[in-house]
Curated annotation (Swiss-Prot):
InterPro entries: LexA (IPR006200), LexA-like (IPR039418), LexA/Signal_pep-like_sf (IPR036286), LexA_DNA-bd_dom (IPR006199), LexA_repressor (IPR050077), Peptidase_S24_LexA (IPR006197), Peptidase_S24_S26A/B/C (IPR015927), WH-like_DNA-bd_sf (IPR036388). Homodimer. This is LexA repressor. Represses a number of genes involved in the response to DNA damage (SOS response), including recA and lexA. In the presence of single-stranded DNA, RecA interacts with LexA causing an autocatalytic cleavage which disrupts the DNA-binding part of LexA, leading to derepression of the SOS regulon and eventually DNA repair. It comes from Moorella thermoacetica (strain ATCC 39073 / JCM 9320). The gene is lexA. The active site is at residues 128, 165. It is an enzyme of class 3 (hydrolase). The keyword Membrane does not apply. CDD domains: S24_LexA-like.
């Protein structure tokens, strides 16, 4: 991420770059709203103004779709098979997963690794999934979906807290099972599924 940009601005800039590389022309305001989850066109205009003030883009107010990228960027982020994946912080019940206030950073990842253009990443805290090879400090790549099959590793929301567990549905209850033999399953009757874990990124220090 560019050091002088917030995660939100970086995500908008990366989306514009990606859209231009794929289509050969800039996105519309509506395109940016849809891709980033922003509901207000005025908010998009505000972000574009900030990017222009910082020298990242140039716009022609007399023409629509007139956004020009001014700053160079690594070939990796320009590749047509790359997607910008947001790293989320706290996930709150009743709030869209990709709400901009949840985004801590943005990472360019190969589309095959991300699994979906709307994928997101979460930072793992704890050792409840160590026997599945998911360690404290790892970054999980998650495909948003609200359903799951038995045996899927999911991100679920329980009482305003996100948890990563194996998912199993039974006739009278749901079990969220840790991959740690020292821990017990969580037995619930209702749960909100936020997504399925489709990949993992680990940094070796």
């Amino acid at each position: 991420m560019q050091p002088d940009l917030s995660p939100q601005l970086a995500m908008v800039l990366n989306y514009i770059r990606h859209f231009i590389d794929i289509n050969g022309y800039p996105p519309s305001i509506r395109d940016i709203c849809k891709a980033t989850g922003l509901r207000s066109s005025s908010t998009v205009y505000n972000y574009l103004n900030k990017l222009e003030e910082k020298g990242y883009i140039r716009r022609d107010p007399s023409r629509s779709r007139a956004i020009e990228i001014l700053t160079p960027y690594p070939a990796l982020t320009r590749a047509k098979n790359m997607v910008s994946v947001p790293l989320l912080g706290k996930i709150t019940a009743g709030q869209p997963i990709l709400a901009f206030e949840n985004i801590e950073d943005v990472f360019p990842l190969p589309a095959d690794l991300a699994g979906a253009e709307n994928a997101f990443m979460l930072h793992v805290s704890g050792d409840s999934m160590i026997e599945a090879g998911i360690l404290d400090g790892d970054y999980l790549i998650v495909r948003p979906q609200d359903t799951a099959e038995n045996g899927d590793i999911v991100v679920a929301l329980l009482e305003d807290e996100a948890t990563v567990k194996y998912f199993y549905r039974y006739p009278d209850h749901i079990e969220l099972v840790p991959a740690n033999s020292s821990m017990q399953p969580l037995i619930v009757h209702k749960v909100t599924i936020l997504g399925k874990v489709v990949g993992l990124y680990r940094h070796f220090s």
